[in-house]
């Protein structure tokens, strides 16, 4: 039977009443739940300084990195991202955040970006779920 381990990161504490896991390591594959910039985005909105899609995407990608590192991995292990946005017009801002996050990597993960009618809280503009394999590195990706 393939080993399964729940991954936790100090930068992304599990909610006490959550009915999900932020990340599971199944063998060498890390599967991450959809991540948002909550609660930081809500706190910023309450101060009258709402975070734009670029800022939210950077927070979320930082959470993805924290979970990867907690599992013993790195950004080069990411092979698939699903990006959900509430405004398709934000796709360029999300793209900029991705360029910054994957700077120097060469090969980007496969990705889907779709517009959705809403996320769990109204101030959220971006949600990302991710898959990684600890036994691959996209920095060493061959071209077909």
Please tell me what each predicted stretch does.
Residues 1-62, 66-79, 86-144:
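N-terminal presequence-like segments and the immediate start of the first folded domain
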